[in-house]
């Protein structure tokens, strides 16, 4: 469950290399309107976000460098690498 939530935030929660707190809050509020996160899931969000970011970065590398080399998209995985260095406090919205 929380991996999907983390993947959604990786895909839609960033703008120009910056995680957007309001997008995280909206995503979480929508999710929790249907299904509340457990305390264990809340605590795991930073690790799941990192895992989701790495997963997308690895997929982009495989797709655009190894499987179907494409000069235009070959460096897209680096966006995910850069995100790994950015700190984001999920606990501000995770209550």
Q: What kind of region is each of these model predictions?
A:
Residues 56-95:
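ATP/Mg2+ or Mg2+-diphosphate-binding catalytic cores
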Residues 20, 41-43, 70-73:
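Residue-level recognition of alpha-helical structural elements
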Residues 2-36, 52-67:
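Active-site activation/catalytic loop segments of kinase-like enzymes and analogous catalytic loops
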Residues 37-49:
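All-alpha amphipathic helical-bundle segments outside canonical DNA-binding/catalytic cores
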Residues 1-5, 10, 76-84:
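Gly/Ser/Thr-rich active-site loops/lids in small-molecule metabolic enzymes
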């Amino acid at each position: 469950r929380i991996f999907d939530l983390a993947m959604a935030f990786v895909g839609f929660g960033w703008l120009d290399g910056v995680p957007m707190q309001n997008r995280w809050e909206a995503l979480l509020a929508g999710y929790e309107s249907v299904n509340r996160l457990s305390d264990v899931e809340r605590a795991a969000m930073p690790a799941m976000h990192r895992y989701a970011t790495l997963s997308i970065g690895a997929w982009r590398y495989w797709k655009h460098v190894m499987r179907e080399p494409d000069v235009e998209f070959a460096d897209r995985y680096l966006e995910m690498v850069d995100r790994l260095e950015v700190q984001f406090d999920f606990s501000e919205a995770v209550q």
